[in-house]
Amino acid sequence: MADHVQSLAQLENLCKQLYETTDTTTRLQAEKALVEFTNSPDCLSKCQLLLERGSSSYSQLLAATCLTKLVSRTNNPLPLEQRIDIRNYVLNYLATRPKLATFVTQALIQLYARITKLGWFDCQKDDYVFRNAITDVTRFLQDSVEYCIIGVTILSQLTNEINQADTTHPLTKHRKIASSFRDSSLFDIFTLSCNLLKQASGKNLNLNDESQHGLLMQLLKLTHNCLNFDFIGTSTDESSDDLCTVQIPTSWRSAFLDSSTLQLFFDLYHSIPPSFSPLVLSCLVQIASVRRSLFNNAERAKFLSHLVDGVKRILENPQSLSDPNNYHEFCRLLARLKSNYQLGELVKVENYPEVIRLIANFTVTSLQHWEFAPNSVHYLLSLWQRLAASVPYVKATEPHMLETYTPEVTKAYITSRLESVHIILRDGLEDPLEDTGLVQQQLDQLSTIGRCEYEKTCALLVQLFDQSAQSYQELLQSASASPMDIAVQEGRLTWLVYIIGAVIGGRVSFASTDEQDAMDGELVCRVLQLMNLTDSRLAQAGNEKLELAMLSFFEQFRKIYIGDQVQKSSKLYRRLSEVLGLNDETMVLSVFIGKIITNLKYWGRCEPITSKTLQLLNDLSIGYSSVRKLVKLSAVQFMLNNHTSEHFSFLGINNQSNLTDMRCRTTFYTALGRLLMVDLGEDEDQYEQFMLPLTAAFEAVAQMFSTNSFNEQEAKRTLVGLVRDLRGIAFAFNAKTSFMMLFEWIYPSYMPILQRAIELWYHDPACTTPVLKLMAELVHNRSQRLQFDVSSPNGILLFRETSKMITMYGNRILTLGEVPKDQVYALKLKGISICFSMLKAALSGSYVNFGVFRLYGDDALDNALQTFIKLLLSIPHSDLLDYPKLSQSYYSLLEVLTQDHMNFIASLEPHVIMYILSSISEGLTALDTMVCTGCCSCLDHIVTYLFKQLSRSTKKRTTPLNQESDRFLHIMQQHPEMIQQMLSTVLNIIIFEDCRNQWSMSRPLLGLILLNEKYFSDLRNSIVNSQPPEKQQAMHLCFENLMEGIERNLLTKNRDRFTQNLSAFRREVNDSMKNSTYGVNSNDMMS
């Protein structure tokens, strides 16, 4: 007993050190000791002692979090009886201790929610023992306010817990639990929550009473969690679902047809303090977003009418909207009015004219107060963008009145941005123009709004632009002009150039008229005249933000008015001809190139301008007709003949800048490569002339490497710049003739230099990444450009170099030792990922016969594959799926290996094979469809190989199985659980998930079934028996039909028949299970 007391005291002391000490070393030691405690065998009993006898809240918190970890573990899970005991203990503990610290109560409720979720399908005497949440909390709800808060919080946390997938359990299991919870409990919880809210709002709540205050807050959180539930498993990315539909089940219809539900929340909004209102509005946002198909047309019109009335009432009494959180949620609510309902439906609402006037006034006022809640403006602009986009399609006879109000919104946005410039400069405030992402998002929305009543938009822009441009010109000519006044006009012109680019980019070909094109011409003329003025001053001064706005304008102009699809008779070109003498597209392209060269000359050290300028050049070089016109321009010929640091400073070796600043060079040379290819043909002299600067750079690096002591920084910069340039050229050269010139130039002369760089600087990703990426590009047989002559050994020689580089990098990178978690991708995994991509490109390029390597005793292939295995085994399973680029490169390489090199896979050690199979098993449930599809393909190849070898081994053949195949079969027979697990997973996904790649899933399934017929039979029986008695026969028939006409082979005809059967099977199973709330009581199916 004394030992228990002593160890409790130690644990309490450690908790105090962990949560209270300011000394980092002490805290880390305490953390380490507590981790050991969590993993100790007597953790469970000590946690109970801590809860019973612990004197501090921190020790209670530790006990609750440790117990949560224990019940969550997937290996060695706690027995069912023990988990039931913990659940009951937690409920009793909460019921007898209402005055616990809030964080302790929260941790215990989290423990209850986790046990309930993970035990959702656990049965004891035919009773689902963890499905009694509402019964469990009834005793809390019938007690005092303090207990009622605990009960509501339990339901809220449970709903939230079941809605969230976690990485330690398969997604299929999560969705099955969520679906069952949705069907059996969620509506009851939502109804209970609404009833409690009605009771609370019916009483005169004393919100000075902190407990009643807390109860209302928890009820609103619970209601929001119910409405925010992922009903059909589609909201995997919460950052992008802001305009999504809430997929309310049909069984909830009654709650939404009853107008009192909607009215409850509008009444609450007006009757409770502003601090609660954001949650009320969040609930209204979700209610406004219920799927359209929940109602028929008449019901939807009635629901929309109530919704619009509620919005109108808020707009007529806007006092609470001065709170930023309320304002933000209300803007979201307004955006849902158009994302979920059609303009034709809105205009039929009785109060529409008054409501659209109020919304327009609210929007104009909001835009004028640009400094208040800027992130909320997105939702208002989204509403008006959707309204404006609907105008051409609206069929209703009722007036939409948008021709009156959209110009007001456009004017408010434009004038408010211009007026903000002076205040921002005067008060030193944060400039919205610094956040180019936010500005671009708003401009995309304005582009649609501004095209509605475009004449008014253009007239306003011309008037404001002329005023600012004239003032700017006068200030530049005045000797006494203050820098502040010049900065203000430059800021105003920056906004105007951005906005002009946006409205031109908003042009829609089928809805545009000659008059609107002529108006575009007026705007373009003004921007180009301003560009001439600012370019003429670049030698003295320049404005970075204005230059970025110009580039944004050029990009929009290019998309709309330059290219193969543009009608050359456009009135825009007529206006450009009259004002600026630009008669056709070629002359306009000349202006583009002139601007690009000017920017590269004067802004070569400004990364944002350089990268956007080069992106513009790159985009121009893609178009079939524009690239041919560009090549004829003298400025483009100048670039092709003078691409050196003397003319383009960003190509220089600036010792002050970072090595990663050279990324833009790849873009530059991709564009130059495309331009060069237009007229290159087979002209080797022209090619060699073009490559002279790169040849000189290679020779310089070779010279440095040949001496024992050289300037390492200079060598690195020269090499990194060079390989980035070459990757751009290699990417552009996608024809055989041009690519062969590049290959013969680089091999064998310069390949040793790349190998030497990897050998020297393997630990520095700033050097290795560009070199590895270049090699990956060189071995990529894009557009069949790597077609060597039949007498050429170059394909094999290229693969030897690939193997050499992978082996050298791989062996050296593994010597790095332990890498900190936050640096592991940059220092190690990124390079490994590129090596995987490189090997995949080489193996699938169809320019090497890999059979000859072993035949002639060449170990290049074997070295590359063995290095791949070494690198793979150095990566934890979790990292393979945590880093998307690594996932995609690994699984696509594995797909090639299982397809063409299965003998190599079969020859691996058992632990390696199990590692690879585990990675495939985990990848089957990945959220990335590409990864999941790749895993299906890998599994199909492995299963097919196994089936063929098994078939051969049972036949009397004169030639025995080779040693690798025999060993592989033996390993698979020793570990059948891995293949069986994958059979469970695939079948589970097909039956219970929103399976987006059903065809891919079907291909390995037949082989899995044929290899595991007894297991499949047991699995089938388990699924059938888990259904309600009246549905079991139908489910049994579904499985019978699945195997109807299927033979015991994997021939294409048989596979195709199975795939067809599977489509019908999935449909029939879904129909059969639609009204079923029963789950699958099978550990195999759920794991």
UniProtKB/Swiss-Prot annotation:
Q: Where is the Importin N-terminal domain?
A: 30-96
Question: Subunit notes for this chain?
Answer: Binds to nucleoporins. Found in a complex with XPO7, EIF4A1, ARHGAP1, VPS26A, VPS29, VPS35 and SFN. Interacts with ARHGAP1 and SFN. Interacts with Ran and cargo proteins in a GTP-dependent manner.
Q: Name one GO molecular function term.
A: small GTPase binding
Question: What are the record keywords, sorted?
Answer: Acetylation, Cytoplasm, Nucleus, Phosphoprotein, Protein transport, Transport
Q: Which SUPFAM superfamilies match?
A: ARM repeat
Q: Which InterPro entries match?
A: ARM-like, ARM-type_fold, Importin-beta_N, XPO4/7-like
Modification N-acetylalanine occurs at: A2
The protein's location, in the record's own words, is:
Cytoplasm; Nucleus
Q: What is this protein called?
A: Exportin-7
The answer to whether UniProt assigns keyword Acetylation to this entry is yes
Give all Phosphoserine modified positions.
S570
Instruction: Give one Pfam family, short name only.
Output: IBN_N
Its GO CC terms are: cytoplasm; nuclear pore; nucleus
Q: Which organism is it from?
A: Homo sapiens
